[in-house]
């Protein structure tokens, strides 16, 4: 049992796992920010532009609620396509942000790859043989 715990500790403390965990936490927080931007800023403005529509209220009612006084006997059944539009916009914004991030990382890695490497000097024995060859060519 102790060996399994040690192996798990080694696995959990590797750089990739910790980096991934940090990425997931930051990604979750970023998703909440984007959702708030879409729900609280973008969708009200879009709704105002298209005639004061609240997108979260857009739905197709398949079955109306059955009420008895103030008591709901059977809830309404509806297709909430307005909420779907809002969530789709969330996804598009997050996907675009991730695309820009990946594009930036790829550009940085290309710059690192394209940096010219200094030519490696040949070993001393190869240099000596090259000098001997050149001297023999010049003496002919």
UniProtKB/Swiss-Prot annotation:
<keyword id="KW-0813">Transport</keyword>
<dbReference type="GO" id="GO:0008381">
    <property type="term" value="F:mechanosensitive monoatomic ion channel activity"/>
</dbReference>
<dbReference type="InterPro" id="IPR001185">
    <property type="entry name" value="MS_channel"/>
</dbReference>
<dbReference type="InterPro" id="IPR037673">
    <property type="entry name" value="MSC/AndL"/>
</dbReference>
<dbReference type="GO" id="GO:0005886">
    <property type="term" value="C:plasma membrane"/>
</dbReference>
<comment type="similarity">
    <text>Belongs to the MscL family.</text>
</comment>
<comment type="subunit">
    <text>Homopentamer.</text>
</comment>
<keyword id="KW-0812">Transmembrane</keyword>
<keyword id="KW-1003">Cell membrane</keyword>
<keyword id="KW-0407">Ion channel</keyword>
<comment type="function">
    <text>Channel that opens in response to stretch forces in the membrane lipid bilayer. May participate in the regulation of osmotic pressure changes within the cell.</text>
</comment>
<feature type="transmembrane region" description="Helical">
    <location>
        <begin position="11"/>
        <end position="31"/>
    </location>
</feature>
<dbReference type="Pfam" id="PF01741">
    <property type="entry name" value="MscL"/>
</dbReference>
<keyword id="KW-0406">Ion transport</keyword>
<keyword id="KW-1133">Transmembrane helix</keyword>
<dbReference type="InterPro" id="IPR036019">
    <property type="entry name" value="MscL_channel"/>
</dbReference>
<feature type="transmembrane region" description="Helical">
    <location>
        <begin position="82"/>
        <end position="102"/>
    </location>
</feature>
<protein>
    <recommendedName>
        <fullName>Large-conductance mechanosensitive channel</fullName>
    </recommendedName>
</protein>
<keyword id="KW-0472">Membrane</keyword>
<keyword id="KW-0997">Cell inner membrane</keyword>
<dbReference type="InterPro" id="IPR019823">
    <property type="entry name" value="Mechanosensitive_channel_CS"/>
</dbReference>
């Amino acid at each position: 049992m102790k060996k399994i715990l040690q192996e798990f500790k080694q696995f959990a403390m590797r750089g990739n796992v910790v980096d991934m965990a940090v990425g997931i936490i930051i990604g979750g927080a970023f998703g909440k920010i984007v959702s708030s931007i879409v729900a609280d800023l973008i969708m009200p403005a879009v709704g105002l532009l298209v005639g004061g529509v609240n997108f979260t209220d857009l739905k197709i009612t398949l079955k109306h609620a059955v009420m008895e006084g103030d008591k709901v006997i059977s809830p309404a059944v509806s297709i909430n396509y307005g909420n779907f539009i809002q969530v789709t916009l969330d996804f598009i914004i997050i996907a675009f942000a991730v695309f820009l991030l990946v594009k930036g990382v790829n550009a940085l890695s290309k710059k690192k790859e394209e940096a010219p490497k200094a030519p490696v000097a040949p070993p001393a024995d190869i240099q000596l043989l090259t000098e001997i060859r050149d001297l023999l060519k010049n003496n002919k």
